[in-house]
């Protein structure tokens, strides 16, 4: 299993995205894209806190109960964001997509508008996640679910699927899939071709 990753800032601003990839073995990987919420305070700090929390939970490896491990990481991120929000007197939050692969099994979760795609050997690319977004009558979009520093752990659904023999899994921020040069753009691609 191989991976590539890329993250770049939008035009004239700080990169508010963070990428984390942990590969404990050739058959295991944890990959995540965090997209700090630009409408809140310190989005780049929010996404880094999320990435650090996941790293802390998964640094000892992928356990047998992966959904519980993902929930623990998101709970830790909420706790850390809440502390940082209080310390700064600010509002922090981020959208996040996480993929955990162990052998031929994948667990994934997305909160906000970070997307996860699966391309199988027949080149059919399908979206595995739904955006947690509400668009008002003026066309302004708002996240309806995200990791934020208010002490409230969001509703987290962890999905599981068996992977085909050959696949590509992509986790990407809205700046990537909307191809907007103004927004930050981040992607992690995991490839299994052997």
In which residue ranges do the predicted regions lie?
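PP2C/PPM-type serine/threonine phosphatase catalytic domain
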Residues: 1-194
């Amino acid at each position: 299993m191989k991976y590539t990753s890329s993250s770049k800032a939008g035009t004239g601003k700080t990169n508010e995205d963070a990428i984390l990839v942990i590969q404990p073995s050739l058959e295991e990987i944890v990959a995540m894209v965090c997209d700090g919420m630009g409408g809140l305070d310190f989005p780049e700090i929010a996404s880094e806190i999320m990435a650090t929390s996941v790293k802390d939970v998964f640094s000892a490896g992928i356990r047998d109960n992966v959904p519980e491990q993902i929930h623990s990481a998101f709970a830790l991120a909420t706790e850390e964001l809440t502390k940082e929000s209080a310390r700064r007197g600010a509002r922090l939050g981020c959208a996040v997509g996480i993929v955990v692969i162990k052998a031929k099994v994948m667990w994934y979760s997305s909160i906000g508008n970070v997307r996860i795609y699966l391309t199988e050997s027949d080149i059919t690319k399908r979206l595995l996640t739904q955006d947690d977004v509400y668009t008002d009558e003026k066309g302004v979009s708002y996240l309806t679910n995200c990791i934020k520093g208010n002490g409230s752990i969001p509703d987290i659904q962890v999905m599981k699927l068996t992977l085909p023999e050959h696949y590509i899994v992509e986790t990407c921020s809205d700046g990537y899939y909307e191809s907007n040069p103004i927004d930050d753009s981040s992607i992690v691609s995991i490839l299994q071709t052997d």
